[in-house]
């Protein structure tokens, strides 16, 4: 196995294979509902909003995977442990619950229901139909989670091309016969005055940056299996493979958001991206298109849900080995996901926003610290101060994103209004940014002031390890 990082590189075929793996890891049918909804609201400012969306929806996930390798961490629990052991458990649990049974898994059921099942029933008895559909959906998810087989691999290999094929036909139809001019559709809501930052925050909804921290170790392990071990080589090859994936995702987001913007010329506003997607599909392909879409999206989301249930169950089993077994976790997460799914897609998205406003700043700073930690020796004091400052600010971003009636009940409306007026970037949902920078600065100062004591402690620790190793070797020789 090679040690020279300059000679550790993937072949073109291997690069494409890992690019496909990254694409499958991050991109699901649910990802389409956010750019198309963003386009329907941003209208003529869609391209500006898209730039912000691509930063959080495409670039950050790639950086997240890379940071796991560069920081020499064994997954999310290892990277977050650089802040502290207690924090690593808190952040890992919060992240997996978010991309698991609280939001992402329930969304896997409500997206195909909203996009393709609900229109077939003409909006009648929606609660009953959703309950039946989600019950069947999660029964299948649980069955595959308890007894996974090769069918999931087959579904992934067959359905991803099918789904992309259907999407390509939709894009071509929109190009040949657009629903209207994007430039003629006025932006609404926050997109009218702050399209870039609103698009930036909309990218949070993909949850891909969070997923990159959770599943980044999978890509790193694949690279190691191909003889890529040096941190620099891991970063370089991940970026190389990820660039192909990012270009494909960016193109899909571009076309889908433009279609969403064009739809604003003929359709009234929708409650969520699922409704926009089904309206556009029906416009071009009629009810036949809806049925085809129902089949493809349902199975694609089914595969994603199984992956999330198995991932979350396995993680909680490893975090709490003496609590309950893996299969019990799978049952619990499937039942919780079923209950939350029956709130509906719009409610799930709305409830997830405050949580994402809290978690994303912590994820972004952790990713960047993992990437550039070599510059300060991955000193814990820098991780700790940055995280503490960011966490405090993120709590207020969480509060500001709560529904207005909740803020009123908590008597925090005036406080949030004051902060939006006087705290830099707070009104844009980026109030954590300056505190995070201050936290980095404070941590670097502490690291500099304690560098001699830290070096002495490291030398003593290394000497102890060497003595232990030598003693063990002597015993073995005897």
Locations of regions flagged by a protein language model:
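Membrane-interface loop-to-helix entry segments
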Residues: 144-174, 352-364, 383-393
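Hydrophobic, small-residue-rich membrane helices and short re-entrant helix-turn-helix hairpins
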Residues: 147-158, 196, 219-248, 265-278, ...
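A generic transmembrane alpha-helix motif of multi-pass inner-membrane proteins
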Residues: 195, 379-478
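Membrane-water interface regions at transmembrane-helix termini and the short interhelical loops
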Residues: 70-74, 137-159, 225-228, 338-351, ...
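Hydrophobic, membrane-embedded alpha-helices of multi-pass small-molecule transporters
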Residues: 16-27, 173-180, 189-256, 289-304, ...
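Hydrophobic alpha-helical segments and their helix-loop junctions in multi-pass secondary transporters
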Residues: 101, 105, 164-191, 209-210, ...
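TM-loop-TM module centered on a large, flexible mid-protein loop between adjacent transmembrane helices
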Residues: 75-84, 252-302, 309, 318, ...
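Selective recognition of specific alpha-helical transmembrane segments in multi-pass small-molecule
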Residues: 59-64, 162-174, 208-211, 238-264, ...
């Amino acid at each position: 196995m090679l040690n020279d990082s300059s000679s550790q590189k993937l072949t073109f075929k291997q690069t494409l294979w890992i690019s496909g793996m990254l694409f499958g890891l991050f991109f699901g049918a649910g990802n389409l509902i956010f750019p198309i909804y963003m386009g329907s609201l941003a209208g003529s400012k869609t391209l500006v909003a898209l730039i912000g969306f691509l930063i959080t929806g495409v670039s950050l996930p790639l950086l997240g995977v890379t940071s796991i390798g560069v920081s020499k961490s064994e997954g999310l629990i290892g990277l977050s442990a650089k802040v502290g052991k207690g924090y690593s458990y808190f952040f890992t649990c919060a992240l997996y619950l978010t991309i698991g049974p609280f939001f992402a898994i329930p969304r896997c059921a409500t997206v195909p229901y909203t996009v393709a099942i609900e229109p077939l029933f003409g909006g009648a008895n929606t609660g009953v139909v959703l309950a039946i559909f989600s019950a069947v959906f999660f029964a299948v998810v649980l069955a595959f989670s308890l007894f996974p087989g090769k069918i999931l691999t087959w579904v992934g290999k067959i359905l991803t091309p099918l789904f992309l094929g259907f999407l390509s036909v939709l894009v071509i139809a929109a190009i040949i016969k657009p629903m209207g001019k994007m430039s003629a559709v006025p932006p609404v809501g926050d997109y009218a005055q702050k399209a870039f930052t609103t698009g930036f925050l909309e990218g949070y909804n993909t949850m891909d940056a969070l997923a990159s921290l959770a599943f980044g170790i999978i890509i790193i392990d694949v690279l190691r299996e191909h003889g890529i071990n040096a941190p620099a080589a891991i970063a370089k090859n991940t970026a190389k493979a990820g660039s192909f994936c990012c270009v494909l995702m960016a193109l899909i987001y571009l076309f889908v958001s433009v279609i969403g913007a064009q739809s604003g010329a003929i359709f009234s506003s929708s409650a969520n991206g699922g409704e926009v997607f089904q309206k556009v599909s029906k416009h071009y392909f009629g009810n036949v298109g809806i049925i085809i879409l129902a089949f493809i999206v349902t199975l694609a989301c089914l595969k994603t849900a199984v992956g999330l249930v198995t991932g979350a169950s396995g993680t909680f089993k490893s975090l709490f080995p003496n609590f309950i077994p893996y299969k019990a976790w799978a049952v619990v997460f499937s039942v919780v996901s079923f209950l939350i799914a029956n709130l509906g897609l719009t409610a799930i998205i709305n409830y997830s926003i405050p949580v994402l406003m809290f978690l994303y700043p912590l994820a972004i700073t952790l990713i960047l610290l993992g990437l550039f930690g070599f510059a300060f020796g991955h000193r814990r004091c820098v991780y700790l101060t940055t995280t503490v400052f960011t966490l405090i600010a993120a709590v207020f971003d969480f509060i500001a994103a709560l529904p207005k009636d909740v803020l009123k009940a908590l008597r925090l409306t005036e406080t949030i209004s004051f902060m939006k007026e006087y705290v830099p970037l707070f009104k844009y949902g980026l109030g954590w940014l300056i505190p995070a920078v201050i936290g980095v600065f404070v941590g670097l100062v502490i690291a500099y002031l304690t560098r001699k004591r830290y070096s002495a402690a490291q030398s003593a620790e290394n000497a102890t390890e060497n003595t232990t190793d030598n003693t063990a070797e002597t015993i073995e020789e005897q």
